[in-house]
Amino acid sequence: MKKNHWIAASALACMLALAPSSVEAENKVDNKRPPVAERNFTSKAVEQLIKEVSKAIQDPKLREMFQNCYPNTLDTTVKFQMNGKKPDTFVITGDIDAMWLRDSSAQLWPYLVLMEGDKELQTLIAGLINR
């Protein structure tokens, strides 16, 4: 694991692990991610980080919240395609199918530390830059 990746994962895991826990059954968070076949984009590096960080989060509710929230942009708001040989990434940044440069960049920022080992993620980010 690369240093930046490890630092980001460790910081996030510590933050979530130290947060107050709740054991109330009615507060349980279910997996809200779309089925794999219905996700807009899947990154092997993101999925691996979710597994690693989830092991460090003791509170089940916080663990499931992380598992649902961290990949949400890739799961639901990214539209990726190739225009010829050029990648093209559209990121829905609101309640309508519109893309704002600042917002779309901010939505993909948490995944930048994972790019080095994930060619598909690199191509997705290149598509955003091309936009």
Predicted regions, residues:
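Low-complexity, Ser/Thr/Pro/Gly-enriched N-terminal "stalk/linker" regions
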Residues: 26-99
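Membrane helical hairpin/interfacial module
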Residues: 89, 93-131
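Sec/Tat signal peptide C-region and signal peptidase I cleavage site
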Residues: 21-24
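Generic structural signal for hydrophobic core residues of well-folded globular domains
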Residues: 15, 73, 111-115
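Bacterial N-terminal signal peptides
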Residues: 9-19
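Bacterial N-terminal signal peptides that target proteins for export
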Residues: 1-10
